[in-house]
Amino acid sequence: MSGHSKWHNIQAKKGKVDAKRGKIFTKIGKEIVVAVKQGGPSADSNPRLRDVIAKAKANNMPNDTIERSIKKASGELNAVDYETITYEGYGPAGIAVLVDVLTDNKNRSAGNVRYAFTKQGGNMGSTGCVSFMFQSKGQIVIEKKDGLDEDELMMMALDAGAEDFESEDEVYVVTTSQEDFGTVREALEAEGLEFLEAEIKMVPDTYTAIDEDTATKFQKMLDVLEDDDDVQNVYHNAEFPEGWEE
C-alpha cells in the first residue's frame, strides 16, 4: 500500500538538535510527568503513559531515567506542573505548522514560538488556522533489516487494524487511527518487532513542495523551535526538495 507519510523526508530535516540525546530525554521526561499526573503511575492502567514509555524506549532512554520521571510525577520527587499548549501558524511560503509545547510559563513559550515564526518570514496564527489540515494518527516506524519480509509485515499490520503501510528508503511506516494505535502497536510488539518510533502525531492531509530557498529558511525555523526545551513536537506539511541538504 502506498501512503503519504513522507517520514524519511521530514525526519531528515527535523533539525540537528534532535541528535542531542540529552535534549530528547528532557522532552520525553516532561511527557512522562504529564501522563502520570493525568492517569497515574501504572503503565498497565494508563495508556498515555504506556505510549510515552514506548517512545522513550524507542529513543534508547535508560530505564532508571524513565523511573525517575515517573517518581517525580507521582510525588516521590519534586515535580513542576506543566501546561500543554498547541500553537498554530504559517512558515515561509505559507507552510502550515503546528507546535506542541509543555511549559511552566506560557508567556515565555508564546514569545519564543512567535519569534521562531517571524524570524524566517512566517507568522503565528489563531487557534484553528491550520489544524484542520491535519489528522491525529498513530505512526509506527520499523527499520528495514535482513530477514524482515515486507509482505508479511504489511499483512501483519493490516490484520491488526492498521490503516496504511508504506515502504520508504530505510524504513517501513505503519499508520493507524488514533483509536487503534495501541492495539496495532501491541500486536506488532508481540511478534518481536522493535520500533524506531511509535507515537500519536498530527499528519497533514496533503504535502506542499517547497524550493531550496524556502527549505533553507524553514529549516532555520525548525532548528530554533526544536532547540527550545518547551517545544515537544513540530508538525508541518512541507515536502523538502529531493536530495536537499542544509
UniProtKB/Swiss-Prot annotation:
It holds the Pfam family TACO1_YebC_N. GO terms for cellular component: cytosol. Disulfide bonds: none annotated. The keyword Transcription applies. One of its GO terms (biological process) is regulation of DNA-templated transcription. It is found in: Cytoplasm. It comes from the Bacteria. GO terms for molecular function: DNA binding. SUPFAM superfamilies: YebC-like. Transmembrane segments: none annotated. Keywords: Cytoplasm, DNA-binding, Transcription, Transcription regulation. InterPro entries: Integrase-like_N, TACO1_YebC-like_2nd/3rd_dom, TACO1_YebC_N, Transcrip_reg_TACO1-like, Transcrip_reg_TACO1-like_dom3, YebC-like. Belongs to the TACO1 family. HAMAP family: Transcrip_reg_TACO1. This is Probable transcriptional regulatory protein CLI_3132. It comes from Clostridium botulinum (strain Langeland / NCTC 10281 / Type F).
